[in-house]
Amino acid sequence: MNPTTEQVLSPGEIFRQTREALNLSLEDVAKEITLRPSILEQLENNEFIQKSTPAIFVKGYVRSYAKFLRLPDSVWENIVFAETEKNDLGKNARSTRAVNQYSSHNRWIGRLTAIVFMIVIGMTGLWWWQSYQQNTQERDDLVQSYVASTENNQPATALVTTEESNKTVPETAAPVSQPVEITNNLLPEIAQENSVSQPKNDEKSVSEIQSAVENPSISPTLPIAKGDLVIEILTNSSWISVKDNARHVLAQKEYKQGEILTFNGNEFSLIVGAPSNVRITYKGENYPLKVDGRVAKFKLSQP
């Protein structure tokens, strides 16, 4: 009868009978192997499959309990600590269908993402192009306003020089006619007073006065405008651009006949649209311009 009962005993019953044979309670064993009494009770009730505890931990509990009770490993080696999974042959087919179902969805999402990305790139490029054109327009407007301001300032200086030149001409021309009348009345007296002391000087001065009386229209040529660079518009009109050595615009517009520009300095960059209509005097000397029907671009400098 005993062999039959031993074969029928389960591992949990063996654990319980062995513990009772040693006169040990669950609390005593729990203190020795540092396990909760509830876990030992589950093991004695053959509850080796637990959903809240992984199988590897349950197996460790059984090994520790059997080692403490000095039971052979054959008592618990055949215990199943987890449910065996059945071989599902249709699992691969179901997973394949699921993958194929979602792959088409993923392709549609990918295409939509690509379209949205292209739209974003296009909008970004359009915004950049519009801002670039706006910046270019603002830059052009700034340059044009600067050129217009310089052109508005240059005519004032040109008018001042022309007015001053017009004032100097009558002042210098007025004394020419007065000596004619004075010399007509005082010529004999001057000749008589100076004939005793300086006869040579008298003859020279008398000849000069007589030539002035005989040719009252002849007068010494006086410079109309003074400056290191003088530009005169002789006929029609011409485009004139003048810059100094620092590339600052001194004059830049179309000037008409009779206008005179004067500048002071040593280095200038000039652009003359019609060289045949312009006369340039630099440092008191006439600067020859090449008349070939083309725009003249040159620099003036003096060390």
Curated annotation (Swiss-Prot):
GO terms of molecular function: DNA binding
Gene3D superfamilies linked: lambda repressor-like DNA-binding domains
Stored SUPFAM superfamilies: lambda repressor-like DNA-binding domains (SSF47413)
Pfam families cross-referenced by the UniProt entry: HTH_25, RodZ_C
Source organism superkingdom: Bacteria
InterPro entries, per database record: Bact_Cytoskel_RodZ, Cro/C1-type_HTH, Lambda_DNA-bd_dom_sf, RodZ-like_C
Cellular component GO terms, alphabetical: plasma membrane
PANTHER family: CYTOSKELETON PROTEIN RODZ, PTHR34475
Name of the protein in its database record: Uncharacterized protein HI_0367
Taxonomic lineage from the root: Bacteria, Pseudomonadati, Pseudomonadota, Gammaproteobacteria, Pasteurellales
